[in-house]
Each structure stands twice: as structure tokens, then as C-alpha cells.
């Protein structure tokens, strides 16, 4: 499905629990069948309105395997910052 079209500036809150555990094991509440990293990148890149801020939540380093989730969170923040830099 498509992202709704927004007319006002957008704040993104990315919950790491929403990713499939294959991509994001370091969370408190894993969601089997969750989103892939590619799906989330596609969603971020498809945003057509101004992004004014963001946060990433629900990272649990005690459950992270080889820092997979930390690296994924950093990649997602890079994508979001890239979107914020668009004029």
C-alpha cells in the first residue's frame, strides 16, 4: 500500500520492533513477519513532504546479535537524514 500524502511537515518515529527479527534481533518485542530493511528504505524514499525530525526507538543492545540492529538503526538514520536534507 502507499503512504498517505501529507501537506504539513513530517516527523518520523521509527520503532525497531517493527522490523522482522532477521534484520533487527536487538529489540525487546520481536515481530516475526515484520518489515525488511528494504521495505523501510522504500517507504522513507517515497515520502514527498518535508521531513523536519526523527527518532529511532525500541533498540535493546542486550538482545542485539553482533550489533546487527545497531548498524540497521544507523543505516535507517542515514536514510532519514538524507530525506531531511532534500529541499
Predicted feature locations:
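Catalytic cores of soluble, metal-dependent hydrolases
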Residues: 1-87
Amino acid at each position: 500500500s502507499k503512504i498517505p500524502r501529507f501537506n504539513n511537515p513530517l516527523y518520523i518515529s521509527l520503532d525497531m520492533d517493527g522490523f522482522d527479527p532477521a534484520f533487527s534481533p536487538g529489540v525487546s518485542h520481536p515481530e516475526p513477519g515484520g518489515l525488511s530493511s528494504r521495505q523501510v528504505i522504500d517507504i522513507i524514499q517515497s515520502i514527498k513532504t518535508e521531513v523536519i525530525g526523527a527518532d529511532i526507538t525500541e533498540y535493546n543492545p542486550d538482545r542485539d546479535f553482533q550489533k546487527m540492529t545497531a548498524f540497521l538503526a544507523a543505516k535507517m538514520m542515514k536514510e532519514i537524514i538524507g530525506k531531511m536534507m532534500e529541499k
